[in-house]
Amino acid sequence: MSHKGHPYSASGAFFLDNPIRRLIQPPSELIEKLAINPNDVAVDFGCGPGYYTIELAKKAKRAVAVDLSSEMLKKAQNKAEKAGVMNIQFLQSNGTNIQLEDSSVDIILLVTVYHEVGESEAVLKEFNRILKPESKLIIVEVIKKGIFHGAPVQNPEALKAEIESGNCKLEQMLPQKNTGIFFFTKKT
């Protein structure tokens, strides 16, 4: 599976969080499918301007917004403050060294981000470190061409094989418009 390793520029944050996207792809629609427990710690990896972070935080005990870009994190933090959502921790990381305790996370969510991860093997190892046993890694990627996604189309079988090599098992894949929601569980 090819990875660009080029994160989305903060100058394009408007395209990640705008009224048209909210009509077509409301963040609450995806978050409802995740079955988040009120005691969960949920990570929004590659959070960008916080499009999904706020909804995660509303469902979970605590949300952790992780992004490589300090500019994106500032946008997400400003958005959280305006929304009055205070249970979010903001961390800058490329994913190879996330400043969280071992086995402290219930859910890691990546929405059209995994294809941008440069060091996927190291990132999967880090996810494995911070995930609790039998917790969830949820990856949303484009699996067929559509008019609203600029992200490259991913091969579902290649994605499954790569993630499963990182100590996770695919439990379910839900097609949603032109994306696939891949639910992985950390192996014990």
What do these predicted regions represent?
Residues 11-31, 151-153:
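Conserved SAM-binding loop and adjacent beta-strand
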Residues 134-141:
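Conserved beta-strand signature within the Rossmann-like core of class I S-adenosyl-L-methionine
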Residues 106-119:
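A short SAM/SAH-binding and catalytic strip from SAM-dependent methyltransferases
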Residues 1-12:
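N-terminal, positively charged/glycine-rich alpha-helical extensions of SAM-dependent methyltransferases
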Residues 96-107:
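A short acidic, Gly/Pro-enriched loop at the edge of an enzyme's catalytic core
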Residues 175-188:
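Core SAM-dependent methyltransferase catalytic element
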Residues 121-133:
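A short glycine-rich, Lys/Arg-flanked "PGG" loop and its adjoining helix->strand segment in the class I
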Residues 43-45, 49-97:
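Class I SAM-dependent methyltransferase SAM/SAH-binding core
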